[in-house]
């Protein structure tokens, strides 16, 4: 562990989960849902010390009486007041540090609106008075974590999926592709197809139950049509899940129909390409000389790549798209759920990175737009 006195803080603000900790650590200290919950009902017990808002795990545990909101949608902050609450919670309750004493490394999805970055920078310096900060691209950090400098990262979280080709440490911006289809859309889709089975999930709290079902029971089929046939002819693929009230529900083909949507977005009524095609298209936008290295270093990262069977399916789909002699290797590190954070921890503790920070002084001289000059 780096010296905690001056260690940089690494905060990976995902659309679904916030991962936070100290640079130099090998895993985040705090991982909690990026949720702000507000009571749906009037408090009647005087002196109960009810709060007007709850953040993270506390909101999750009281979800039955709260309306849950995610301030980050598709990787873009849509509610800055709630976002500030999440950061405040991160620094003061989870990490128990004073942000004015530590440099802060934040992460962002590529191709985000410029205003999003500027506002993040402004809040860090003006609200939390950080001495220095930096905004890094999520996928680039995942590649650092895998110990590579060349490869294409397919990063899929709760809010956004993106493919970023990186060569010798340089991201190739013209070839970055982004798909606004990720874990949250899969959760919504699972809610929908479970309704067809006669199980109704509607509230924001029930959506969290469905997310848990998704995380525990879903998997990616190697051959979708064949799997559908198997599911229709036998009950071998059925699994049961116990709801919080003790009721047990059974799910069958929903287990693989749900994540199939990232390979076939038409399931969600979207016109975009699946993740395999997006990855392929991204490689094809790169110079012909470096494609071979990208095919051989396709790195998966993010929570939505955690489904069993996803690496084999990617291998199969990309092999079908690529030239027949091409060697294709899909790298799916076991810790890929946190690889963005781990990469941030590595980056912020490199001695060569120390001159990259945006200092409070630079911010005061140039204003929020400094972030575009100093952070790729």
UniProtKB/Swiss-Prot annotation:
Main EC class the enzyme belongs to: hydrolase
Alphabetical list of PROSITE patterns matching this protein: ACTINS_1 (PS00406), ACTINS_2 (PS00432), ACTINS_ACT_LIKE (PS01132)
Protein name: Actin, cytoplasmic type 5
PANTHER family: ACTIN (PTHR11937)
Top-level lineage group: Eukaryota
Residues recorded with modification Methionine (R)-sulfoxide: 45, 48
Ranges that cross the membrane: none
Assembly and binders: Polymerization of globular actin (G-actin) leads to a structural filament (F-actin) in the form of a two-stranded helix. Each actin can bind to 4 others.
Single Gene Ontology MF annotation: structural constituent of postsynaptic actin cytoskeleton
EC id: 3.6.4.-
Source taxonomy: Eukaryota, Metazoa, Chordata, Craniata, Vertebrata
GO CC annotation, single: actin cytoskeleton
Subcellular localization, as worded in the UniProt entry: Cytoplasm, Cytoskeleton
Catalytic activity entry: ATP + H2O = ADP + phosphate + H(+)
Keyword annotations: ATP-binding, Cytoplasm, Cytoskeleton, Hydrolase, Nucleotide-binding, Oxidation
């Amino acid at each position: 562990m780096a010296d905690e006195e001056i260690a940089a803080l690494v905060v990976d603000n995902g659309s679904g989960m916030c991962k936070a900790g100290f640079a130099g650590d090998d895993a985040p200290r705090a991982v909690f849902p990026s949720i702000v919950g507000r009571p749906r009902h009037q408090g009647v017990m005087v002196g109960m010390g009810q709060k007007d808002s709850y953040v993270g795990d506390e909101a999750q545990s009281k979800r039955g009486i709260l309306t849950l909101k995610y301030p980050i949608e598709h990787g873009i902050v849509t509610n800055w007041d709630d976002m500030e609450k999440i950061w405040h919670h991160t620094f003061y309750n989870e990490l128990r540090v004073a942000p004015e004493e530590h440099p802060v490394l934040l992460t962002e999805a590529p191709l985000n609106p410029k205003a999003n970055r500027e506002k993040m920078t402004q809040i860090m310096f003006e609200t939390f008075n950080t001495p220095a900060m930096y905004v890094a691209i999520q996928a680039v950090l995942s590649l650092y974590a895998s110990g590579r400098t060349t490869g294409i990262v397919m990063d899929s979280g709760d809010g956004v999926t993106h493919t970023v080709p990186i060569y010798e440490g340089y991201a190739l911006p013209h070839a970055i592709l982004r798909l606004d289809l990720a874990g949250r859309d899969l959760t919504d889709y699972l809610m929908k197809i479970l309704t067809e089975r006669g199980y109704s999930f509607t509230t924001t709290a029930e959506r969290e139950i469905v997310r848990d079902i998704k995380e525990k029971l879903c998997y990616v089929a190697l051959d979708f049509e064949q799997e559908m046939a198997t599911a229709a002819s036998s009950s071998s693929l059925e699994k049961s899940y116990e709801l919080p009230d003790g009721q047990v529900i059974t799910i069958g083909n929903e287990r693989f129909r749900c994540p199939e949507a990232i390979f076939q977005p038409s399931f969600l009524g979207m016109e975009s390409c699946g993740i395999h095609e997006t990855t392929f298209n991204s490689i094809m936008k790169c110079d012909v000389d470096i494609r071979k290295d990208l095919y051989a270093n396709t790195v998966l990262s993010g929570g939505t790549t955690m489904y069993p069977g996803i690496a084999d399916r990617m291998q199969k789909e990309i092999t079908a798209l690529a030239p027949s002699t091409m060697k294709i290797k899909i790298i799916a590190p076991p810790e890929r759920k946190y690889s963005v954070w781990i990469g941030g921890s590595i980056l912020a503790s490199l001695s060569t990175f120390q001159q990259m920070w945006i200092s409070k002084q630079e911010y005061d001289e140039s204003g929020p737009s400094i972030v575009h000059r100093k952070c790729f």
